[in-house]
Swiss-Prot record:
Residues 8-21 have a biased composition (Basic and acidic residues). Keywords: Coiled coil. This is Coiled-coil domain-containing protein 83. Residues 37-186 form a coiled coil. The keyword Coiled coil applies. The gene is Ccdc83. The keyword Transcription does not apply. It comes from the Eukaryota. Residues 1-25 are annotated as: Disordered. InterPro entries: CCDC83. It comes from Mus musculus.
Length: 305
C-alpha cells in the first residue's frame, strides 16, 4: 500500500513542468518537502516492522506463559502427591480432638468478644458521661463561673455590710447598756435615799420621849463602831456582861415597835464589826440575842442594858 502510494506519488505530476522555471525559494521548499516525505515514509516502514515484531513477541510471551502455567500446575500436583505420600495417617480420635480444640477456641473467642463488647459499651457510656461533664464544665466556665463570681462578690459585700451593721449595733448597745446601768444605778440610789427618808419619817412617828436616849445611844454605838480601834473595841467589851452568849432576851416595857426597828440594824452592824475584829473571843450562839435579830425577830427583841 505504501509502495503504491509511493508509485502514485512518483507518477503524479509534481509541480509545474520542467520547462517552466521556478523561483529559488519555491525550489528550496519543494526540496525540503521531498526530504520530509521520504523521512516520513522511512519512519512508517520502521513502525510497521516494529509492530510486526511486537506481535511476534506477544505471541511468544503468550505461549511461554501457557507453558509456565502448565509447568507450575504439574509442579504443584507433584508436590501435593509427594506431601500426601509423606504425611502421617490421621485417626478419627485425632480429628475429633482437633475439632473439640477448635470449638473450644471458638467459644473462648466468642466469650472474649462478648466481654470486649461489654467493655466497649461501658467505655462508650463513660465517654458520654465524661463528654457531658466536659460540656457542663465548659458551659460553667464560659457562663456559670462569671455568674457565681458576681454572686460571691455580692454575698461578700452583704456579709461585710452585715458585719459593719452588727459592729455599729454592738457599739450602740454597749453605749445604751452603760447609759441604762448608770440610769438604773442613779434611780436605785434615789429610790434607796427616798426609802431611807420614808423609813426615818415612819419611825419618827412612833418615837416617844422615853426612846430618845436609846436613839442617842444607838447613834453613839454606830459612830464608835465605825471609828473605834482594837483597843476601843476591847474597852467596849468590858461593858458587856460576861455571859452575853447565854443571856436571855428581854423586852423593855417602854419600848415600842419603832424603837426596836431602829435598834436592830445598829446592833447587827456593831456585832459584825466586833466579830470581824475578835472572831475568837466570843463564840456565836443562836440563843444570844445579838445573833437573833433576823428578819422575823427584829420586832420583838432588843439588847437589855
Amino acid at each position: 500500500m505504501d509502495s503504491s502510494a509511493k508509485g502514485s506519488k512518483k507518477d503524479a505530476p509534481d509541480g509545474p513542468p520542467k520547462d517552466s522555471k521556478l523561483p529559488v525559494s519555491e525550489a528550496l521548499l519543494d526540496y525540503h518537502r521531498e526530504i520530509k516525505e521520504n523521512a516520513v515514509e522511512r519512519f512508517m516502514f520502521h513502525i510497521k516492522k516494529l509492530r510486526e515484531k511486537n506481535q511476534k513477541y506477544q505471541e511468544r510471551n503468550r505461549r511461554l506463559k501457557e507453558e509456565q502455567n502448565w509447568h507450575i500446575k504439574n509442579l504443584i500436583k507433584e508436590l501435593k502427591e509427594k506431601n500426601l505420600d509423606e504425611a502421617p495417617i490421621v485417626t478419627r480420635e485425632e480429628v475429633e480432638e482437633a475439632m473439640k480444640e477448635k470449638w473450644e477456641f471458638e467459644r473462648q473467642q466468642e466469650a472474649s468478644l462478648k466481654e470486649m463488647r461489654i467493655q466497649i459499651n461501658e467505655a462508650e457510656k463513660l465517654f458520654l458521661e465524661k463528654l457531658s461533664e466536659k460540656e457542663y464544665w465548659e458551659e460553667y466556665k464560659n457562663v456559670g463561673s462569671a455568674q457565681h463570681a458576681q454572686l460571691i462578690v455580692s454575698l461578700q459585700n452583704d456579709i461585710d455590710t452585715v458585719k459593719e451593721n452588727a459592729e455599729k449595733m454592738s457599739e450602740q448597745y454597749k453605749v445604751t447598756l452603760e447609759d441604762e446601768k448608770k440610769r438604773i444605778s442613779r434611780e436605785t440610789m434615789i429610790q434607796l435615799k427616798q426609802r431611807k427618808e420614808w423609813a426615818t419619817q415612819h419611825a419618827v412617828r412612833f418615837i416617844d420621849k422615853n426612846n430618845y436616849r436609846e436613839i442617842w445611844e444607838n447613834d453613839w454605838l454606830k459612830k464608835e463602831g465605825d471609828t473605834a480601834s482594837f483597843g476601843n473595841v476591847l474597852s467596849l467589851l468590858d461593858f458587856l456582861p460576861p455571859d452575853l452568849h447565854t443571856a436571855e432576851p428581854c423586852v423593855s416595857s417602854g419600848q415600842s415597835r419603832g424603837s426596836l426597828r431602829i435598834l436592830a440594824p445598829f446592833a447587827l452592824q456593831l456585832w459584825s464589826k466586833l466579830s470581824g475584829l475578835l472572831p475568837t473571843l466570843v463564840t456565836p450562839d443562836p440563843v444570844c440575842i445579838i445573833w437573833s435579830f433576823g428578819p422575823g425577830q427584829t420586832n420583838s427583841m432588843a439588847i437589855c442594858p
